[in-house]
């Protein structure tokens, strides 16, 4: 066990991954310190976290929110320095004092600080899949060039990481890997009549059967866009060609993913659906620590079911495979369109089935370019968001 206290910057501290990360830190105060806590706009929740964990820094979206938090911290004698904006996120992901960064900001907003952490050679615990979806080539190049340690936190990719040999970077085929089996619950609508999907409400879409998640990722799970993004993420994390990544619908969410080998073996990681398990694994790797998760009781499982995904029902999953094969900025365009589509659905401005239709319309209208630089990626992201917003305002899919 390492005797050095690890300073951790938590990007997305008030979200579900951030809260679970802080729970693991709470259980191991002799190993980890919450050095910087970064959130979007939840002042009350971030203040409570600052009181408990006493970070050196806290970050919020804008100056007004930061001023409110700063005043509240001073009123209780906290010396936490409160900052705001993207530049603060970038700085607190790359300071020399920082040992590890939990990258858990949802969506494209997490790209720049997570890339900064990689370029600073940090241990990057990656929960933000959009970083690899938008800029996989740039990000993986930074990880290699600057000697960062990259550990996946998504339960599926963490399971794959655990099921691969330690030297998988020399090439999956060289390691005897035939397939990466990426499991998916199928979301709340996997068995719903197709006619019923036209009337799905945000509340129904956010009611995931197995996992406790934020609203955006819950909707992505319901459309299986989440799994599509994870296919792209797996491609970059493990240098796996698209045809090597097979999505398997597994409603119980007990097998978190698996790897099929040339000798007929299939190695899988099993566990109760609790994000503290992959978080604790990433934090302590290559060691293992208690995560507060109830052990899996094999006698209570009773059965495990598996099926192939329905690409007609889950059009977003097919779109993800399509943009992965196309390459360049196509994945960034899909991600941007989807973020706008999901936000519109949650706000009542787009029907559930309109999410996939809008994503496809943006991809058809906007040609992909090369992923040459961060500026290219951000420009494609901005253009796709603008186009998606226009289509929604025109009520093309109402």
UniProtKB/Swiss-Prot annotation:
Question: Which GO terms label this protein's molecular function in UniProt?
Answer: 1-deoxy-D-xylulose-5-phosphate reductoisomerase activity; manganese ion binding; NADPH binding
Which pathway does it take part in? Isoprenoid biosynthesis; isopentenyl diphosphate biosynthesis via DXP pathway; isopentenyl diphosphate from 1-deoxy-D-xylulose 5-phosphate: step 1/6
Which EC number(s) does UniProt give? 1.1.1.267
Q: Which residues bind 1-deoxy-D-xylulose 5-phosphate?
A: 129, 155-156, 185, 208, 221, 226-227, 230
Q: Which reaction does it catalyse?
A: 2-C-methyl-D-erythritol 4-phosphate + NADP(+) = 1-deoxy-D-xylulose 5-phosphate + NADPH + H(+)
Per UniProt, where does Mn(2+) bind?
Answer: 154, 156, 230
Q: Which domain of life is it from?
A: Bacteria
Instruction: Give TM segment ranges.
Output: none
Per UniProt, the keywords (alphabetical) are:
Isoprene biosynthesis, Manganese, Metal-binding, NADP, Oxidoreductase
The entry's protein name is 1-deoxy-D-xylulose 5-phosphate reductoisomerase
């Amino acid at each position: 066990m390492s005797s050095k206290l690890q300073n951790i910057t938590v990007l997305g501290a008030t979200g579900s991954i951030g809260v679970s990360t802080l729970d693991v830190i709470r259980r191991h105060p002799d190993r980890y310190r919450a050095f910087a806590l970064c959130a979007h706009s939840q002042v009350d929740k971030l203040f409570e976290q600052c009181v408990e964990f006493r970070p050196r820094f806290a970050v919020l979206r804008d100056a007004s929110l930061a001023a409110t938090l700063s005043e509240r911290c001073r009123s209780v004698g906290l010396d936490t320095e409160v900052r705001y904006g993207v530049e603060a996120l970038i700085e607190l992901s790359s300071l020399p004092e920082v040992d590890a960064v939990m990258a858990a900001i949802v969506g494209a907003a997490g790209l720049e600080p997570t890339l900064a952490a990689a370029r600073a050679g940090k241990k990057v615990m990656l929960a933000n899949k959009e970083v690899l979806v938008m800029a996989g080539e740039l990000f993986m190049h930074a990880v290699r060039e600057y000697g960062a340690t990259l550990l996946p936190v998504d339960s599926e990719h963490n399971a794959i990481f655990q099921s691969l040999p330690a030297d998988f970077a020399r090439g999956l085929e060289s390691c005897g890997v035939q397939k990466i089996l990426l499991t998916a619950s199928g979301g709340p609508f996997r068995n719903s009549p197709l006619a019923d999907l036209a009337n799905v409400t945000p509340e129904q879409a956010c009611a995931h059967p197995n996992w406790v998640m934020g609203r955006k990722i819950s909707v992505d799970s319901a459309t299986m866009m989440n799994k599509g993004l994870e296919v792209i993420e797996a491609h970059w994390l493990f240098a796996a060609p698209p045809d090597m990544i097979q999505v398997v619908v597994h409603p119980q969410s007990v097998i978190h993913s698996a790897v099929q080998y040339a000798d007929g073996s299939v190695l899988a990681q099993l566990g109760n659906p609790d994000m503290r398990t992959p978080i604790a694994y990433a934090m302590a790797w290559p060691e293992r620590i208690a995560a507060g998760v109830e052990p899996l009781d094999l006698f209570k499982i009773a059965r495990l079911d598996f099926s192939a995904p329905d690409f007609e029902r889950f059009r977003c999953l097919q779109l993800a495979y399509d943009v992965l094969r196309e390459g360049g900025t196509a994945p960034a365009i899909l991600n941007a369109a989807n973020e706008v589509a999901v936000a519109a659905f949650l706000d009542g401005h787009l029907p559930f089935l309109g999410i996939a239709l809008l994503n496809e319309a943006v991809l058809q209208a906007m040609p992909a370019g090369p992923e040459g630089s961060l500026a290219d990626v951000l420009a494609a992201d901005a253009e796709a968001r603008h186009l998606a917003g226009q289509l929604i305002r025109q009520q093309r899919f109402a």
